[in-house]
Amino acid sequence: MSRRFTVTSLPPAGPARSPDPESRRHSVADPRHLPGEDVKGDGNPKESSPFINSTDTEKGKEYDGKNMALFEEEMDTSPMVSSLLSGLANYTNLPQGSREHEEAENNEGGKKKPVQAPRMGTFMGVYLPCLQNIFGVILFLRLTWVVGIAGIMESFCMVFICCSCTMLTAISMSAIATNGVVPAGGSYYMISRSLGPEFGGAVGLCFYLGTTFAGAMYILGTIEILLAYLFPAMAIFKAEDASGEAAAMLNNMRVYGTCVLTCMATVVFVGVKYVNKFALVFLGCVILSILAIYAGVIKSAFDPPNFPICLLGNRTLSRHGFDVCAKLAWEGNETVTTRLWGLFCSSRFLNATCDEYFTRNNVTEIQGIPGAASGLIKENLWSSYLTKGVIVERSGMTSVGLADGTPIDMDHPYVFSDMTSYFTLLVGIYFPSVTGIMAGSNRSGDLRDAQKSIPTGTILAIATTSAVYISSVVLFGACIEGVVLRDKFGEAVNGNLVVGTLAWPSPWVIVIGSFFSTCGAGLQSLTGAPRLLQAISRDGIVPFLQVFGHGKANGEPTWALLLTACICEIGILIASLDEVAPILSMFFLMCYMFVNLACAVQTLLRTPNWRPRFRYYHWTLSFLGMSLCLALMFICSWYYALVAMLIAGLIYKYIEYRGAEKEWGDGIRGLSLSAARYALLRLEEGPPHTKNWRPQLLVLVRVDQDQNVVHPQLLSLTSQLKAGKGLTIVGSVLEGTFLENHPQAQRAEESIRRLMEAEKVKGFCQVVISSNLRDGVSHLIQSGGLGGLQHNTVLVGWPRNWRQKEDHQTWRNFIELVRETTAGHLALLVTKNVSMFPGNPERFSEGSIDVWWIVHDGGMLMLLPFLLRHHKVWRKCKMRIFTVAQMDDNSIQMKKDLTTFLYHLRITAEVEVVEMHESDISAYTYEKTLVMEQRSQILKQMHLTKNEREREIQSITDESRGSIRRKNPANTRLRLNVPEETAGDSEEKPEEEVQLIHDQSAPSCPSSSPSPGEEPEGEGETDPEKVHLTWTKDKSVAEKNKGPSPVSSEGIKDFFSMKPEWENLNQSNVRRMHTAVRLNEVIVKKSRDAKLVLLNMPGPPRNRNGDENYMEFLEVLTEHLDRVMLVRGGGREVITIYS
């Protein structure tokens, strides 16, 4: 039976005294000046964390003092948290081009200007830019026509579908944008980093083409407003008859569009700052125009504007060629013909030959804007689709028709339909009016808090614009006559912009406002598209585009601007706003589709890095948005959709063709094997990206003689970490030879597989037979996994009762395991008290998972609670993070920085900074160190039986008590675990305690105690204390039955005749014990009731003579805690703030 005795020293009645100056002097001695001490660590440095960038001087300062001496060997690769937090919390991403600008200034030798930190908030940085990009040319030039053709009901459905598509995309985009810091690069960065370079490049180029064609659309809108509504006389090409007007207009659009494009490209080339300066002016024009529309709607309810339209029968007449809506007019007492008569008749005389329809039908004049109170909404409720060349007619008007087949003279002043219209065409034309939702994410580098601003600003902007569009559909249908709505260019209202006729106070507000807004939108497109192409080019994923990554010294994309202008010219040569709009709809819809796909894939995969701060998303919403985008692509134009998908597919294959390989197996299993082989070969190409890091576990378990797992809780914990979605290998080692123990290995594998299935652990099992345990574990660590699918984390249990083992190889194997994982750059998880860990059926209804973040080793400590809380066992546990502040640290600022850092990490946790100031090393620490070193000497230099070991250590402790009390009679308390275990017993036995109590307040024995106030003179004198010994029954029986000692008792006492003094202790061990004791006191105080405590695991010493001391340090560090997980990072595991 294993036994343990506890030596407890009760405080004296008098006041306690602190250690004398001599001991104090040694307690603060500089450890770097101690002779013969080796503090270089274990010789297996971990990989440097990507967050670490400290100088050697800083490293030297980080562990001055005693509080963190236990972790001083980690400082080369893992800095103290206090020295790291400020840089992480105050991370700022520079706007695109600022780095190149700084480099150019440095090359010129000029004085570098400080880069201003981003200061834009949600309103100015996201909301207003999104409004400016969403509201555009379609609202002013085409929405009234869409309502007139499709009717209020279908237009409402159209607007609702398109706005729903963008809203779902914005939700997905918000999830991606808040999944880490999004540097300058915006939507392309988000897509490419979420779906990989192939999809990212394909979708990025589609988004670039969409933005470029959007610039062409805005320029065409600008020219249409200029020539149709502002200065019609500026037209260069004029038609000889009505049938040639359309062709003349297209040529005018091409000429003026090319000129405007050249001017805009020049402005962008000269300096984007001018574009940004006028951005607010252009936005003000948009908002003012929209407010004018609503003001006009309100005014029309009680005072409609006067815009009469002329009808011949039920046919709408264009007002360009006449002024009086009548056939005849009275001049005095004489009846004369009007100009309208001359348009339909052969002469101005009453007996002239006139058009038959003109002769049979009357001319009437009605108000084009009856107003909101007119009840017109019922007439405009349903659709009136037209074919090309058809006259726009008013329903409900009496008309004397002509015989079927009678040709219509195109020279007559009717309002004709210029194109065949149908629902899907209108969707393609309208959809560009809801694009522009990426404007906020494109400015992510300029935002003060992108994770907060992008979701809030984008969703509010979409909600605002959607409300404006939906209300505009209803209000246009309620206020404007149907024939006017179907009149695309406002010919029936004297060539006025249709929406301008409704505006108040004047139609010119809308005309001028829409002109400047379309100019501004065109400039924004020509500014954003080249930068997007530059970002794609600099990624190097499309080799032939790399030339466009170069630019001016300040980072302006000169070559990319040139290519953008050339592509934009293609859209201008098309010259039709209605033809260009469906093209850019395809590219934007494809971009939005892949944004939704990225969010759905990330949500379903549940990778450890997927931690969006935006919570209101779901994979079903993303899938719905993706399906809606795909449907809208084919609704708008199925052939354009196929072309766009073909372009994206070709780009995808071009990017990945070097690594692509097709291989077909026979049957599903053959296909699976081929896919697995292909995936493993792809993984072999390079190490995984930081964002894709996840714990790939190698779980080391021990099996008993019946090949059953000794600690099944390890596999339960593995199952609870399955949110990491990584590889799991459960390994075990059997001692012996392969030929003799192969059957046992097979049984062990079957037993482990059954337990894995019961615990729902998805992974592989591997049992190794080796001549000794250390080599077997080393082989598992080195050879586990296949190709790129290898473990990066080792999970193992703490060696229970390591003090009680006859064979010291048990804890030596453990320390060698720590060294080998460090050498292999693997993370190590050590569970202490694993039998107390919960099984999968258990549930914690409350409690906390406490993280003690002492040194930064890559973020593994942060990741593990996040993964555990995804499991139902730990789901209701809150996460608390504690970090330690030293004397020179500002604990208040540390708490703020840590809170900011966790915000960037998208992790919700309570934060507390624990202050550990420099303090004198207590007598208890000296006593613990003394006994540790004495026991180490005994066990190393003498081979005693178990009973002798107990008796001699007890004797040494009693003899050294007087020396210790002379040095410091303060409150001392000593615990020694000296076990006894029956031979061959590998199972843990219940421990029984023997207490040796030194009662300083009890009266001493007269024969051995000095007189009052007298100090003991000889170190061999009996200590003036009353000693109580409590022995268990089993202990007594064992003491009676113990055999003769092979070593003389006198010889043992001669060996320890030297008296232990505090001065003779290794000061490095004292400082490390001081760290362990102080940290343990703080951790127990704060986290005694925690369901799980995670803390950094210090590395083992280089000098193997101190291995047992290392075990003792860890034991002291974690005592009095129920469930502990020691975490030692390898440097490759990183929990990143990036998306």
Curated annotation (Swiss-Prot):
What is known to happen upon mutating L311H? Answer: In DEE34; results in reduced chloride transport; decreased localization at the cell surface
Q: Which residues carry this modification: Phosphoserine?
A: S1045, S1048, S1049
How this protein is processed and modified after translation, per its record?
A: Phosphorylated at Thr-929 and Thr-1030 by OXSR1/OSR1 and STK39/SPAK downstream of WNK kinases (WNK1, WNK2, WNK3 or WNK4), inhibiting the potassium-chloride cotransport activity.
Protein's cellular compartments: Cell membrane; Cell projection, Dendrite
One GO CC term of this entry? neuron projection
Disulfide cysteine pairs (residue numbers): C310-C325, C345-C354
Q: Where is the composition biased (Basic and acidic residues)?
A: 19-45, 98-111, 945-962, 1023-1042
Domain of life assignment = Eukaryota
What ranges does the Extracellular topological domain annotation cover?
A: 121-129, 204-229, 277-402, 454-485
Give TM segment ranges: 99-120, 130-151, 175-203, 230-250, 251-276, 403-420, 430-453, 486-513, 535-555, 556-578, 593-615, 616-632
Q: Which GO terms describe its molecular function?
A: ammonium channel activity; chloride transmembrane transporter activity; metal ion binding; potassium:chloride symporter activity; protein kinase binding
Swapping T92E leads to an effect described as:
2-fold increase in K(+) influx
Compositionally skewed regions (Polar residues) per UniProt: 46-55
Q: Where does chloride bind?
A: A184, Y414, V415, E569
Show the segment(s) annotated as Scissor helix. 667-681
Summarize what activates or inhibits it: Inhibited following phosphorylation by OXSR1/OSR1 and STK39/SPAK: phosphorylation takes place downstream of WNK kinases (WNK1, WNK2, WNK3 or WNK4) in response to hyperosmotic stress and subsequent cell shrinkage.
Q: Which residues are modified to Phosphothreonine?
A: T57, T929, T1030
Function, as annotated, reads: Mediates electroneutral potassium-chloride cotransport in mature neurons and is required for neuronal Cl(-) homeostasis. As major extruder of intracellular chloride, it establishes the low neuronal Cl(-) levels required for chloride influx after binding of GABA-A and glycine to their receptors, with subsequent hyperpolarization and neuronal inhibition. Involved in the regulation of dendritic spine formation and maturation.
The family this protein is said to belong to: Belongs to the SLC12A transporter family. K/Cl co-transporter subfamily.
NCBIfam families reported in the protein's UniProt record: 2a30
Q: What is this protein called?
A: Solute carrier family 12 member 5
**What gene is behind this protein?**
SLC12A5
